[in-house]
Amino acid sequence: MIAVINYGAGNLPNVVRALQRVGATLTVTDNPEVIRSAQAVVLPGVGATADTMASLRHLGIAEVLPAVIAASTPFLGICVGMQVLLSESEEFGLHSCLDIIPGTVRRLPEHAGKIPQIGWNQLQISPTFRNHPLFADIPDGADVYFVHSYYCAVADEAIIAARTDYGIPFPSVIIRDHLAAVQFHPEKSGDYGLRLLANFVRWSEAVQPKGV
């Protein structure tokens, strides 16, 4: 059972429908104990990191997620669900995040063009991750859909599985052990987005979490 975290994110229904379309067995929950015992966890998100962190803390989810990820529970963060994994965010002032992935959430550079980036852009998959299960049947250069003004400046470049250019080459996918996170919206990314979600479902089914 995949736990899809419900903390009020606007893209939650679309993420749920996309996961159901690829055959996922899931529950939508804001219960920390359900999240703790899940076979896999998906954290969707749109909006500001500070607001998201406030909701996660209020629900008691912020305290559970580090332990869930440390237990090797397969995890997928989407958009802001990726950004809150970092140490801190510069969005609307400096705010602390979950500090699971060392790094800072920073604004896209003004010379990139229109901010936020809204629309299709390419994944440049790192050769190191080319054969990772998450990228099965997804070619290098695949177009996926972005809506964001901030990006994840991660401290460890070895976890950057794919980059995308928008003024700068920013991490669009990170993978560390059984944690994956994407800056784009797979639920809006057509066939390639559905493939990534299907790949995550298969990947999560093959992993046995250690238990929290």
From Swiss-Prot:
Per the record, what are the reactions this protein catalyses? 5-[(5-phospho-1-deoxy-D-ribulos-1-ylimino)methylamino]-1-(5-phospho-beta-D-ribosyl)imidazole-4-carboxamide + L-glutamine = D-erythro-1-(imidazol-4-yl)glycerol 3-phosphate + 5-amino-1-(5-phospho-beta-D-ribosyl)imidazole-4-carboxamide + L-glutamate + H(+); L-glutamine + H2O = L-glutamate + NH4(+)
Write out the entry's keywords from A to Z. Answer: Amino-acid biosynthesis, Cytoplasm, Glutamine amidotransferase, Histidine biosynthesis, Hydrolase, Lyase
Pfam families xrefs = GATase
Active-site positions on this chain: 79, 185, 187
Where is this gene product found? Cytoplasm
Q: Name one GO molecular function term.
A: glutaminase activity
Q: What is its EC number?
A: 4.3.2.10, 3.5.1.2
Pathway(s) served: Amino-acid biosynthesis; L-histidine biosynthesis; L-histidine from 5-phospho-alpha-D-ribose 1-diphosphate: step 5/9
Q: Please report the stretch or stretches of sequence annotated as the Glutamine amidotransferase type-1 domain.
A: 1-210
**What are the record's GO terms for cellular component?**
cytoplasm
Alphabetical list of SUPFAM superfamilies matching this protein: Class I glutamine amidotransferase-like
Show the PROSITE patterns listed in the entry.
GATASE_TYPE_1
**BP GO annotations:** L-histidine biosynthetic process
Report the InterPro entries cross-referenced here.
Class_I_gatase-like, GATASE, Imidazole-glycPsynth_HisH
The record's subunit annotation is: Heterodimer of HisH and HisF.
| Entry-linked NCBIfam families | IMP_synth_hisH (TIGR01855)
Q: What does this protein do?
A: IGPS catalyzes the conversion of PRFAR and glutamine to IGP, AICAR and glutamate. The HisH subunit catalyzes the hydrolysis of glutamine to glutamate and ammonia as part of the synthesis of IGP and AICAR. The resulting ammonia molecule is channeled to the active site of HisF.
Q: What is this protein called?
A: Imidazole glycerol phosphate synthase subunit HisH
